[in-house]
């Protein structure tokens, strides 16, 4: 694989990891009116399993998966949840869902607008990430067949300590069977197509909004599911 292409993917994931977008880069709608008030309330008892965002903007047209000839077309854009700033387990969950969906969107389109609407820590670095990805050829000259980012949660509910919420989970990445770099298709070895790593999702609620931070659990084995690595520095990233 092209080093420049791989670095841009790693950097994209580094933005999510630990709020340390700067470290990753060095390695290469309205809110609900209930806002911050009141006690925590959940819409359901069990949030464990895959994190899913419910709403996407599909107005660009029918989605067309990537081929060896062209990148994915009309990629659905994540829609910011109305309750993104609610102080609740549901609000925290929706922040994780929107952030991860935004991460996939920027990885497929080099458009960070969804991430800029999220409450990710250090999101001022997203513009730099966009520039870096575009300089590497994304999305018109560099893409992968089936790039997906998914998060899952290990427990039904997060740990809550005052305004600080913590959820243990996993982040998984799928690249598909090939990537394209400068118009040239390159097969991806099967062992490198899917990677999964334990992550800690944290949220701090302050002044009516969340600050979301995602950190890889660097103490875990780096060989999980295809040789994922933790990257270097605070917050690491997702190595390929």
Task: Please report, for each region that a protein language model flagged, where it lies by residue.
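Secretory targeting signals
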Residues: 1-7, 19-23
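N-terminal export leaders
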Residues: 9-13
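A short, amphipathic edge element
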Residues: 138-158
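Juxtamembrane and targeting peptides
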Residues: 16, 21-25, 29-91
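N-terminal short leaders/motifs
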Residues: 105-112, 152-164, 169
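Exposed beta-sheet edge and beta->alpha loop/turn motif
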Residues: 19, 37-54, 159-240
């Amino acid at each position: 694989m092209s080093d420049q292409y791989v670095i841009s993917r790693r950097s994209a994931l580094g933005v999510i990891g630990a709020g340390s977008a700067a470290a990753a880069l060095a390695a290469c709608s309205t809110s609900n009116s209930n806002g911050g008030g009141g006690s925590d309330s959940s819409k359901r008892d069990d949030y464990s399993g895959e994190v899913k965002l419910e709403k996407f903007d599909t107005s660009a047209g029918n989605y067309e998966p990537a081929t060896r000839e062209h990148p994915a077309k009309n990629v659905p854009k994540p829609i910011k949840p109305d309750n993104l700033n609610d102080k609740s387990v549901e609000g925290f969950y929706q922040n994780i869902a929107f952030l991860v969906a935004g991460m996939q969107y920027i990885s497929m389109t080099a458009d960070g607008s969804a991430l800029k609407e999220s409450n990710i820590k250090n999101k001022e670095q997203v513009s730099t990430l966009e520039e870096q990805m575009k300089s590497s050829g994304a999305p018109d000259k560099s893409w992968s067949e089936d790039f997906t980012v998914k998060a899952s949660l290990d427990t039904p509910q997060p740990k809550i300590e005052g305004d600080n919420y913590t959820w243990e989970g996993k982040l998984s990445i799928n690249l598909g069977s090939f990537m394209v770099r400068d118009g040239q298709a390159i097969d991806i070895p099967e062992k490198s197509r899917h990677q999964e790593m334990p992550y800690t999702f944290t949220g701090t609620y302050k002044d009516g909004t969340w600050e979301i931070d995602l950190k890889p659990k660097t103490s875990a084995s780096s060989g999980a599911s295809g040789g994922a690595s933790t990257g270097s520095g605070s917050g690491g990233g997702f190595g390929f």
